[in-house]
Amino acid sequence: MIRLSLAASILALGAMSASAADLGARPYTKAPAPIVAAAYDWSGFYIGANGGGAWSRKCWDTVPFTIDIQAIPPFTVAGPEGCHTASGPTAGGQIGYRWQAAAWVFGIEAQGNWADLTGSNPSTIPFFAASNLANRTKIDASGLFTGQIGYSWNSLLLYVKGGAAVTSDKYEAFLFAPQAPLPTGFVEARGSETRWGGVVGIGGEYAFTRNWSVALEYDHLFMGDSTVRMTFDPVFNPVLNHNVRIRQDIDMVTARINYRFGGPVVAKY
């Protein structure tokens, strides 16, 4: 009987050992690699072109001056001459450099544009109005020198900018109606200046490849006021030479395309 119990115990232990051996250890499986997303890096030099439209509000004020003609007693001319909007197309190019820290993007840029902004209004000063004189403005060039700060979402960048602005302005006093012997459109006086001011702007830019991006930008130029010398035709009205105080600001909207040099795409985990 004892032998029978001992044999049964040995058989039971053998069966348990066999079951444990059959289970075995689970094989080791390597964890999957983390997903890597490509993050666009805005750092680097870039060059580009832009085009769009602009409009400028111009207000003229004649600085008091005396007209002394032998046929009549001397008299003083002064006062506001009215305002007009000079508008038209603009196109040019830009060059700059950006560097990125986390999602923040900083940059500097220089931009130069050709422009054809023109506008006019009849003078509201009685003496000039009686002489059929109107004022005309033309802005033929502008430049911006700015710093930028922006925030990026991968290949999308929103930014603000600010800095210095410069414009090339030309002014004319012309006949809006004939005044014998002079025809309509005859230019009686001219003036010009290079004016400096400030600029602030906002824009959005999208990189559609590693190096190419497109943007839409709005800028407001604060050009203040400036005194301009108006010189009349020496044959007809040399005694009318005088100074005009002209106030000016400019709004500009442009579409832009940029090519960025180098600047690798950075892996983002």
Question: For each predicted feature, which ranges?
Answer:
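Gram-negative outer-membrane beta-barrel domains
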Residues: I2-Y269
